[in-house]
UniProtKB/Swiss-Prot annotation:
It comes from Ruthia magnifica subsp. Calyptogena magnifica. An essential GTPase which binds GTP, GDP and possibly (p)ppGpp with moderate affinity, with high nucleotide exchange rates and a fairly low GTP hydrolysis rate. Plays a role in control of the cell cycle, stress response, ribosome biogenesis and in those bacteria that undergo differentiation, in morphogenesis control. This is GTPase Obg. CDD domains: Obg. GO terms for molecular function: GTP binding; GTPase activity; magnesium ion binding. It holds the Pfam family MMR_HSR1. Its cofactor is Mg(2+). Keywords: Cytoplasm, GTP-binding, Hydrolase, Magnesium, Metal-binding, Nucleotide-binding. Mg(2+) binds at S173, T193. Belongs to the TRAFAC class OBG-HflX-like GTPase superfamily. OBG GTPase family.
């Protein structure tokens, strides 16, 4: 599964501080020479790679990033203070483009990697700089140069091996938290997941990436709800994991919920509907041993599903180790 998230922002590096026009004026030195100091440099703007981010959503709300200007110089040859540089954190895997030239500025690969994207302006020169044997009282100064201003495009691409299917609030976010390092927000209401949540699942010394896409609803194949914006991403997964809540909080029928998801996949694309998958039946911890098999068989009969089934609890981890082993096996079989 390849997620492509994008954002456009404007960055403005700081302007250099102006040089000072000044002359030394002391009690016993009425005609002192120039003493105007240089200004400070403007702040650069850097991007820094940070683990733990998986979308560019925050850049849809904040689109302007501006570094501070350098301070002007002053008398007694005092230089203005240079501005602090501005560092903007972005997710690993993000490509950085100059939108005006289409130039690829760089790609964020490693945690805490630094990329300079806009240089601050150079400091202005005070009149002391222009003193010479010919001109002992120069009145010339220079302003600080402007900082770089760029229109920046950010593009984040992340590949996932397993895509999670399920109705809203089926327990997918809880499951991905249980078996991976993801920190997806979890609450007891539909549409908990509003953005793709990705987690790295480890099994001995191997790793796969699992993607929890927003829960599907009826007519998602027509764009209803969160629609086919996320359905289309399922094409590039190696396999799918369908999570069914055996006790939905909205009182809906687990069999109908399963069939709704399958129907939407078939309506969207037949090849997608035939993609290899596993079924995880969630909240099995709420049933006693004898009742579990009765409920599972009733679900399988109603859905006519005949593939591999895992009885799990995303909350307390019941059956999750076996599920992880099954996922790794499925991914290897479909590489």
């Amino acid at each position: 599964m390849k997620f492509v998230d994008s954002a456009s922002i404007r960055i403005e590096a700081g302007k250099g501080g102006a040089g000072c026009l000044g002359f030394r004026r002391e009690k016993y030195i009425p005609d002192g020479g120039p003493d105007g100091g240089d200004g400070g440099d403007g702040g650069h703007i850097y991007f820094q790679g940070q683990e733990g981010f998986n979308t560019l959503s925050e850049f849809r709300f904040k689109r302007l990033f501006r570094a501070k200007n350098g301070q002007p110089g002053s008398g007694q040859n005092k230089r203005g203070k240079s501005a602090q540089h501005l560092t903007v954190e972005i997710p690993l895997g993000t490509k950085i483009y100059d939108l005006e030239t289409d130039e690829l500025i760089g790609e964020m690969i490693e945690h805490e990697q630094i990329i300079l994207v806009a240089k601050g302006g150079f400091h202005g020169l005070g009149n002391t700089r222009f003193k010479s044997s010919i001109n002992r009282a120069p009145r010339k100064t220079t302003p600080g140069s402007p900082g770089e201003i760029r229109e920046i495009g950010l593009e984040l691409s992340i590949m996932a091996d397993i895509g999670l299917l399920g109705m809203p609030n089926a327990g997918k976010s809880s499951l991905i938290r249980q078996i991976s390092n993801a920190k997806s927000k979890v609450a007891n209401y539909p549409f908990t997941t509003l953005h793709p949540s990705l987690g790295v699942v480890s099994y001995y010394d191997e790793h796969i990436i699992m993607a929890d896409i927003p829960g599907l609803i009826e007519n998602a194949s027509k764009g209803v709800g969160l629609g086919f914006e996320f359905l289309k991403h399922l094409f590039h997964t190696k396999a799918l994991l369908h999570v069914v809540d055996i006790f939905p909080v909205d009182g809906s029928d687990p069999v109908e919920n399963f069939l709704t998801i399958e129907k939407e996949l078939k309506k969207y694309d037949q090849k997608l509907a035939k993609k290899p998958r596993l079924l995880a039946i969630n909240k099995m911890d709420l049933l006693s041993g004898g009742d579990r098999e009765t409920v599972v068989q009733s679900l399988l009969k109603g859905t006519r599903y005949n593939g591999k089934v895992y009885r799990i609890s995303a909350l307390n981890g019941l059956g999750c180790k076996n599920l992880v082993a099954g996922l790794f096996k499925l991914v290897k079989e479909n590489e």
